[in-house]
Amino acid sequence: MDDRALGMQFSPQEMARLRAAASVAEPVVVHELTSPAARRRLAEAEVLITSWGCPRIEPEVLRAAPRLRAVLHAAGSVRSHITDAVFDRGILVTTAADANAEPVVHFTLAAILWAFKKAPFLANDARRFRDDWAYVDGRGELSGVGRTVVVVGFSRIGSRLVKLLRDLDLARVLVVDPVADPAAILAAGGEPATLADALPQADVLSLHAPALPETRHMIGAAELAALPRDAVLVNTARGSLVDTAALEAACGAGLHAILDVTDPEPLPADSPLYTLPNVMLTPHIAGSLGSEARRMSALALTELERYAAGLPPLAPITRHSLAVQA
């Protein structure tokens, strides 16, 4: 893991818990897996605890780690560092994605509530128009009651979000996910729908699909054009889900957007999305930061303790699940 992840996730308290659960080689942290020093460490390792900044675990890394039995990830997606070779060896892989989902869900719910009231955009209008409150009437409906939220992706985050929206009893929730169980969607308080049917009904479109080749630019010019005039796009998932050129054009024409992720990230300095009053941009802050990140390291340490005790993992990742998850 990188120094930022180490400092954020492993305080002296977490390090003490780590040392109580396993025999720890010193120094405990490596930033790469190819140097002679790292290879000496790998030769002895039975478990790797990984986080942000972990290099890919390629076949040559595994050849240097004959005793490796588990890779316990103290963050969300393992896609950037887990290779097929890891699964070929039968190595256990776990994730702390459930812990990372919580702050994203909370941020997204807040964004949707802001979207109902058009709060970020009216804040920009207030700076521009000051005491002339006529601008309030220019942002369309300013209520969440009886509105429609379209959730794309009944994922860890998407499913939690649907349940929270149900509990608020404000809006109808349409869920677009071709691989999700319709009964599970209904039980969570959503209604299964196709993207084509859902988009024209969306007062808020919230994206929660994984970044896969087949989901790249799933929201393009045609999909953005299908949204109602005063709709708000919320993206706290992955920037690659949206065609950026199409998004810039749509927002330039008036589409409202709350974007915590973009493609590329960060956007070029000359992107119009920085200055449009109908766009709110945040620098990928929805996920775990600060003290939130220690919930992920705590989950990884729990997985380590369970592994040491011969108990099954709480959140295993398989080759199949990785193919359809973020």
Walk through the language-model features, giving the residues of each.
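Alpha-helix C-terminal capping/helix-to-coil transition sites in glycosyltransferase folds
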Residues: A43-E44, A64-R67, P200-Q201, A226-R229, ...
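Conserved S-adenosyl-L-methionine
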Residues: D167-A171, A253
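Rossmann-like dinucleotide-binding domain for NAD(H)/NADP(H)
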Residues: D230-A326
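Short beta->alpha connector loops at strand-helix junctions that form conserved
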Residues: A74-A75, L92-A99, A196, H284
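N-terminal glycine-/charge-rich "phosphate-binding" loop or analogous flexible N-terminal tail
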Residues: M1-V47, L174, Q325-A326
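Glycine-rich Rossmann-fold phosphate-binding loop(s) that bind the pyrophosphate
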Residues: F154-S155
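Rossmann-like adenosine-cofactor binding region
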Residues: R56-I57, V179-P272
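Phosphate-binding beta-alpha-beta segment of Rossmann-like dinucleotide-binding domains, i.e.
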Residues: R89-I91, A96-T148, R160-K163, L168
